[in-house]
């Protein structure tokens, strides 16, 4: 081929290449995922009252934020990702019911990601997915989107998570809040406010709280008992509250806790359980005093105070 022929061929190809570049054909990577935004981008959103930037869609940003829930970076995970998602879900209601359902499915699945591990960074995805699910459950109370079947699945998944989570760390000086027990409690408190929450559910949740406190293998020191007490207070405030079942649950807890004094010195697991239960019951009293008084709540207070006097 002569030099002129080479030039002719190149000139013939050039317009096509330029067209692909500007139109956004495969050569320019239009179908490739958009690059992740840096923290400066997310800080700007938080600083501007959580407004969605121009040329961005809330759900696409939510999917990116969701991928950061497992980050060991406390600013990215907590201050930015969780905080932005919570505002967009509850206060600003940026997402359609279909999008909320999709987030619910993703975050519920995350509760099982690495379950059984302890002391690893896998905890962040599980714990902060539970916290984000609590925002969805709060949104559900204001504008229902889950439906009964999804609600039942979420409640079951939450109880399983509280039962199976082995990593109960509350806080890390470098990586920030971990708080798996507190976040699961926040989710249960929102779910316990639902009209779909039944009397058998009340019993299941109370038993899950007892089990969590008994199996923690430490005395909680980052407010976990307060968050679990809130679940008890929410349950006790329901119009269909099963007072008899509550009193049976409390008596069973109290009897189990008295076992601690059978050994001298007390065995550590029994002592940890005793302390966790005692702190939680004191927090229940505090929570109930902040709520409008009802005959049922007064009975709960009397029963809890009676149990505390025996400690």
Regions found by a protein language model. Give the residues of each.
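Bacterial N-terminal signal peptides that target proteins for export
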Residues: 2-15
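Bacterial N-terminal signal peptides
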Residues: 12-24
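Boundary at the C-terminal end of the N-terminal hydrophobic targeting segment
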Residues: 27-31
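Alpha-helical solenoid scaffolds in large eukaryotic transport, assembly, and signaling factors
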Residues: 46-159, 235, 250, 256-257, ...
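Alpha-solenoid helical repeat scaffolds
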Residues: 64, 79-83, 128, 157, ...
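Eukaryote-skewed repeat-based solenoidal scaffolds used as protein-protein interaction platforms
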Residues: 103-112, 116-239
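A cross-kingdom marker for long, charged
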Residues: 235-236, 241, 253-311
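Intrinsic disorder/low-complexity flexible regions in very large eukaryotic scaffold/regulatory proteins
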Residues: 241-247
């Amino acid at each position: 081929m002569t030099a002129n022929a080479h030039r002719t061929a190149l000139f013939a190809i050039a317009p096509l290449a330029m067209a692909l570049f500007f139109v956004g054909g495969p050569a320019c990577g239009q179908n490739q995922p958009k690059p992740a935004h840096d923290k400066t981008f997310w800080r700007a959103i938080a600083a501007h009252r959580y407004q969605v930037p121009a040329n961005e869609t809330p759900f696409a940003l939510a999917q990116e934020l969701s991928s950061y829930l497992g980050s060991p970076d406390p600013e990215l995970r907590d201050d930015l990702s969780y905080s932005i998602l919570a505002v967009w879900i509850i206060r600003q209601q940026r997402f359609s019911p279909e999008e909320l359902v999709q987030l619910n499915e993703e975050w519920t699945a995350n509760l099982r990601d690495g379950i059984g591990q302890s002391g690893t960074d896998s905890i962040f995805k599980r714990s902060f997915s539970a916290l984000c699910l609590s925002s969805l459950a709060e949104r559900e109370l204001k504008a229902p989107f889950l439906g009964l079947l999804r609600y039942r699945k979420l409640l079951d998944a939450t109880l399983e998570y509280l039962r199976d989570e082995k990593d109960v760390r509350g806080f890390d000086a470098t990586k920030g809040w971990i708080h798996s027990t507190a976040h699961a409690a926040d989710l249960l408190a929102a779910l316990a406010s639902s009209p779909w929450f039944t009397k058998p559910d009340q019993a299941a949740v109370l038993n899950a709280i007892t089990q969590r406190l008994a199996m923690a293998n430490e005395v909680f020191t980052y407010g976990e008992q307060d968050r679990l007490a809130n679940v008890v207070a929410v349950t006790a405030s329901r119009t269909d509250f099963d007072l008899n079942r509550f009193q049976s649950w409390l008596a069973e807890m109290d009897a189990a806790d008295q076992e601690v004094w059978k050994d001298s010195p007390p065995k550590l697991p029994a002592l940890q359980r005793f302390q966790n239960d005692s702190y939680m019951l004191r927090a229940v009293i505090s929570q109930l005093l902040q709520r409008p008084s009802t005959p049922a709540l007064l009975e709960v207070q009397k029963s809890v105070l009676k149990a505390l006097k025996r400690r």
